[in-house]
């Protein structure tokens, strides 16, 4: 997945996944809804997030019955056994590359990391297609095999 898709698959990583899931690929995923909203408010919109955090959380609870702070990729990755490859553009101004480093540190499963210099949000493949493809091929060569259930 890319961006929100990356975050979705990383959050799913903490679930009991079926044995046919041999790996997870995440490109420029963020750590939580609250974390990305805070970053966007502060760095992109240049407004304080403070009280808006509580408002956003309340809106989430009312609309989807889940709080904006309830789930995070960091927590999910502490419980995964599925190999993960994390990719991020070093010059991403929408989702900070530090979030991928947080995810990488939290991940307890076998993991690979590719940071692409000069790439903005979701542009890693387009900046370095050969490097990206080689990293993905190497990842699947290592981990694309049946795994034991933990």
What are these regions (language model features)?
Residues 1-9:
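Gly/Ala-rich beta-loop-alpha elbow adjacent to hydrolase catalytic centers
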Residues 79-81, 86-88, 92:
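Short beta-strand/loop motif that positions the catalytic acidic residue
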Residues 73, 82, 96-105:
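Short alpha-helix in the alpha/beta-hydrolase fold that links the catalytic acid
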Residues 104-123:
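Catalytic histidine neighborhood in serine/cysteine hydrolases
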Residues 127-150:
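Catalytic active-site module of serine/aspartate enzymes centered on a nucleophile-bearing elbow/loop
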């Amino acid at each position: 997945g890319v961006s929100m898709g990356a975050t979705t698959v990383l959050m799913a990583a903490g679930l009991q996944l079926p044995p046919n899931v041999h790996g997870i690929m995440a490109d420029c995923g963020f750590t939580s809804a609250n974390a990305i909203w805070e970053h966007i408010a502060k760095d992109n919109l240049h407004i304080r997030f403070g009280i808006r955090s509580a408002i956003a959380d309340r809106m989430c609870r009312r609309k989807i019955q889940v709080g904006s702070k309830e789930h995070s990729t960091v927590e999910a990755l502490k419980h995964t056994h599925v190999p993960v490859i994390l990719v991020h553009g070093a010059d991403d101004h929408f989702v900070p590359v530090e979030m991928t480093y947080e995810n990488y540190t939290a991940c307890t499963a076998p993991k690979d990391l590719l940071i692409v210099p000069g790439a903005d949000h979701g542009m890693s493949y387009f900046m370095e297609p050969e490097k990206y493809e080689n990293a993905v091929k190497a990842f699947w060569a290592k981990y694309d095999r049946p795994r034991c259930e933990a």
